[in-house]
């Protein structure tokens, strides 16, 4: 049979657990958010590299923006990827929640629309003039460099961490390869 002292100790342990459990849960979900951020950062780096490989490969049919977008989509494991302005400009705008934007440009592109850019598209694309807020298309040829950039908007699930980061973290990864054609 329990004594009065045993019951008091059990009650004290229950109160201590009630005080500590919110902190433990916050730490647990914070670790989950950090794990998600590391996973997505690695994923977008890999997707940018694979997209750049597709953009520069020599084959019977030269690659297009659609080929690069398809490859990046397949590497992003169900995360939606779109290309609102495939040839840029690469701006500081934020993609929709938990989705990514793809850009295929010259290395170190400017943040403004380019009317006459250096080669900034896969060789299978057709030349096109600047259109609204999108840069002109100038297909690469003759061993030029292309940069594939993926910008991803990660929305965090831990409320306290999300408030500290304005509810999201925008990650960006880029790969620069030289064309083979």
Question: What residue spans do the PLM features occupy?
Answer:
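Alpha-helical hydrophobic helix detector
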Residues: 13-33
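Transmembrane signal-anchor/signal-peptide helices with a preference for the extracytoplasmic
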Residues: 33-39
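N-terminal leader/signal peptides at the extreme start of proteins
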Residues: 1-10
């Amino acid at each position: 049979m329990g004594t009065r002292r045993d019951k008091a100790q059990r009650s004290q342990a229950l109160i201590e657990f009630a005080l500590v459990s919110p902190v433990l849960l916050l730490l647990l979900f914070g670790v989950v958010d950090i794990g998600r951020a590391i996973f997505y950062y690695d994923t977008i780096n890999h997707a940018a590299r694979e997209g750049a490989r597709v953009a520069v490969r020599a084959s019977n049919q030269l690659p297009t923006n659609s080929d690069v977008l398809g490859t990046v989509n397949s590497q992003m494991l169900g995360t939606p990827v779109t290309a609102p302005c495939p040839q840029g400009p690469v701006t500081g705008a934020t993609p929709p929640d938990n989705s990514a934007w793809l850009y295929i440009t010259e290395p170190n592109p400017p943040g403004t629309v380019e009317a006459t850019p250096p080669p900034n598209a896969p060789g299978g694309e057709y030349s096109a003039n600047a259109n609204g807020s999108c840069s002109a298309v100038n297909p690469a040829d003759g061993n030029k460099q292309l940069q594939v950039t993926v910008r991803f908007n990660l929305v965090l699930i831990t409320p306290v961490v999300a408030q500290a980061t304005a509810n999201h973290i925008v990650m960006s990864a880029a790969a620069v390869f030289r064309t083979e054609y």
